[in-house]
Amino acid sequence: MKKVKKMNANKQESWLPLVLVALASFIITLDATFMNVSISQLILDLNTSLSTVHLIISFYTLTTASLMLIASKLQDIIGKKKIFMLGALIYGIGAIIAALSQNSAMLFIGWSLLEGIGGALMTPAIISIIIGTYDKNRRTFALAFASAIGGIAAAIGPMFGGFVTTFLSWRFGFAFELAVIIIIFAYSKNIKNFKPQSRKTNFDLIGGIYSIITLVLLVLGVLELKKNMLLSIVLFIISIVFLRLFISYEMKLKASGAIPLVDMGIFKNNNLLAGMAIRFIAMIAMMGCLFAVSVFLQGALKFNAFDTGINLIPATGGVLISALLAERLSRIYSHKILMSIGFVLAIIGAVILRFQFGLHVTFLDIAPGMFLLGIGLGLVIALGIDVSIKGMDEESQSTASGLLTTSQTLGSSIGTAVIGCILIIGATAGIADAVDIYVPDANQTQFEVGTGDYLEKLGNLNESSILSQDVKAKITNIVLTDAMKMVMDFTAILLLIGLILTHTIDNRRVIGRRIRRLRTERLNGPKVRLDRQKLSKDRK
C-alpha cells in the first residue's frame, strides 16, 4: 500500500506525465493545420481533386467534434488513462495508414476517420489527466503549459507542413505523429491510473448516436451546397429533426433520473451559449480563411507547400501572440471589451484582405490583413472558455468544457466546408465575368468546364486545354480574385455577428476578484502596503 502511494506521489512530482499529454495535444492540433498547405501535392500524388481533399479535411475535424461529448463520458466509465491510451493506439494506426496512402480513400480512412476518432478520445482525457495528476499550485502551470503547446502547434503547423511536403513528403508529417505516439506508449507507465467514476449503465448510447447523426448530416449538407442545393436542404432538414430528437431524449432521460449525455439545463446559462456561438464563429472564420488562402496561393500563384506555409505565418503567429497575452490583458480589461476588440481587429483584417488577392500578390500584401485576422481571433478564442464557465460548479464546468471543445472543433469543420464551398461558388461566378471581358464570342459552357477542371486539379492539367497561357492567366486572375472577395465578404459579415454576440455576455460573471483587487491596489496601493507593514510590525 505504501509502495503504491509512493509511486503516485512520485508521478505527481514528475513533469513527465504533463510532457506526454502535451505531446498528444501538440500532434492533434498540428494535424488540423499542416495539411492545408499540402493540398496541391495531395491532388497530384493521389490523383484526386480539390473537392475530394476539401471533404477529407472537413471530415477530420467533423469526426473529432462528433465524438467529443461521447469521449468525455467514456473516460469516466472506462478510466482517463485507459481512454487516453486507446485513443493513442487508434491515432497511431490511422497515422500509419495515412502515411502509406495510395489513394484518397486510404487517406480518408487513416486521417479523417481513425485519427479523428483517436483525437476525440485523447482530447478530453488530456485535461482530466492534468487535473487529476497535479495539485492546485502545479495544476495552473500544467494547464497553461499544455495550452501553450497547442498554440505553438497551431502556429507552426502550416510551416511544418510546408517544410515536410516541399523537402521530404507530406507522408513524413504522419510519420512524425506516429513517432510521438510511440514515445507516449514507451513512457505511458508514468501516467497515473485513474479509477472509473461512473458505471457502464450510465452511458447514454442513444443520445450519442443522435448527436453524431446530427453533426454528420449538418456538415454533409454544407458540402453539398456547391453541387446539389436540393439535397443540401434535405440534409439540413433531417439534421434538424435529429437535433430535436436528441434534445427531447436528453430531457426525458434527465426527468427519469438517469444521466444524460448533456444536461439541457446547462443551456440556461447565457454566457455558455454566447461563448459557444462566439468560439464556433471564430473557428469558422479562422480555419475557413486558412483553407481558402492556401487554395489561392497554390492554385493561382503556383506556390509550393513551404512558400504557402510561410505566407500563413502572420495569421497563426497572431493567434499565438494573442493566446500568450490574453490572460495578462484580462487582469486589466473586461473580457467583453477584449473580445470586442478582437472581433474589430479581425473584421479590419478581412476587409484589408478583400482587396489584396491577384496574380501579383506578395507576402507583404497579405501579411497585415492575415496578422490582424489572427491576433483578433486569437483574443476571442483564448478568452471564450473563461467567459463561458466562470461561476459554474465543478460538475457543470466539465460538461461546459466538453460542449465548448465540440463547438470549436465543429467550427473548424464547418469553416473548411462552408468557406471551401463559397470559394468554389465564387470562382464559378467569376468565370462569366472573365469570359465576357476577354473572350466575349466564346462558348461560355466550354470555358466553365475547362476552368472548373483547372481549379479542381489546382492547375495540374495540360495547359493547352484551357485557352492560351496569357488569356488563361487573366481569366484565372478574375475567377480567383472574385472568389476571394466573396470569401472575405462572408468572413467579415460572420465576424460582425460575432461582435454583436459579445454584447450579450454578462460581464459581471467574468470580472473576478483578481481584477477588483488590482483596481483597489491601483487606487490605494501605497496606503494598503504601509498599513500591512505596520500591522506586521505590531504583531511582532
Predicted regions and their residues:
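Cytosolic juxtamembrane N-terminal segment immediately preceding the first transmembrane helix
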Residues: 1-30, 44
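12-transmembrane solute porter fold
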Residues: 14-27, 35-37, 50, 228, ...
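Extracellular/periplasmic helix-loop-helix junction of adjacent transmembrane segments
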Residues: 38-66, 106-108
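Helix-breaking motifs and short loop linkers at transmembrane-helix boundaries and internal kinks
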Residues: 45-47, 79, 100-106, 168-169, ...
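Central cavity-lining transmembrane alpha-helices of secondary-active solute carriers
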Residues: 58-72, 123-127, 313-325
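Helix-loop-helix hairpins in multi-pass membrane proteins, especially solute transporters
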Residues: 68-206, 224
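Hydrophobic transmembrane-helix bundles of small-molecule transporters
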Residues: 166-278, 285, 303, 311
